[in-house]
Amino acid sequence: MSFNLRNAIMANIQGSSQQEVEATIVDAMESGEEKMLPGLGVLFEVYWKHADESQKDELCAEISKGLNE
């Protein structure tokens, strides 16, 4: 028996409103708990799959800027 964490997270967050997604992200960031990282990764993956090239470029630039401050 194998457990697919990505699918479990998607099943848990599917159908979430914009406000619920934001609350999930804020909660994960404020709690600082490492157990929240896979969920943030799945949310990032969803964003990436739906973003156009300019959105991806902008996001990567912002992340890079934040990593180099």
UniProtKB/Swiss-Prot annotation:
One of its GO terms (biological process) is sporulation resulting in formation of a cellular spore. Disulfide bonds: none annotated. Keywords: Sporulation. The gene is sspI. The keyword Nucleus does not apply. Belongs to the SspI family. Induction: Expressed only in the forespore compartment of sporulating cells. The keyword Magnesium does not apply. It comes from the Bacteria. This is Small, acid-soluble spore protein I. It is found in: Spore core.
